[in-house]
């Protein structure tokens, strides 16, 4: 690990609730001592999209002074700043128009690439991506209630990123669009099992899908991960080292080993596509969790309200049409990428 570290924290966001999530994370960084470490400089990169939920720039840039005082540098990446930067790159012959469009235009991949670019420009050593619908905590399931615990996400990544190109943490909560389906004569469990088995691979398996569905669409944290400091190297499966796009740290000290993000037009999957580029990179799974609140059920968590049970993502046949189609699209996208690079 370097003696003096410039740590970047990147958010690609478009939600009005971003400020609340940011506050929770910054107080988490203070609680674990990172905001007071003189050899660690915290640099915040916020790439925001005003069209996603009809927000204003001030929804992202108007950060409370008590929070900014705990951060060393802050970079807000809006459309205007990015367009000026793209123009400079085009005029300087650094990128062609086609390359700039591929890299900086369209979807979450473009927002993540903007953060990557400004992090490299500011000589950031390590860059951590966090999502605006994830919180630094883990939830486990006991016999009668769920149990909550705080997680030192940044601190855990910092402990291990010096020995890797990428470190990736774990996720709990609502991490996939797979609902709890009420099977019936029209859509039987056996029908759905046969479909899953038809597209299955090392990542998509019926036993995993059934387990998530059995928990009402909720993924609980693995207690063995929480009670040990075990770090695992991510092995390559069918040409991919599968990672997620958040709770993700990238070692920027050797820029030639850093890969950009990509997603197809009007689609997601930027983390899966990046996974296919990592054959020559060392990727570690590190022992920290974030809770994914995909349906915004649990914003009160950030005010200290800890529920004793989690809502099930129910889906009877009346709603299963769209929900199952969404699940199928998600699984089919993953399967397509795996097949392309097999």
What annotation goes with each model-predicted range?
Residues 267-273:
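Acidic donor-binding loop at a coil-to-helix junction in glycosyltransferase catalytic cores
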Residues 130-131, 285-293:
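Catalytic beta-strand/loop signature of glycosyltransferases that borders the donor
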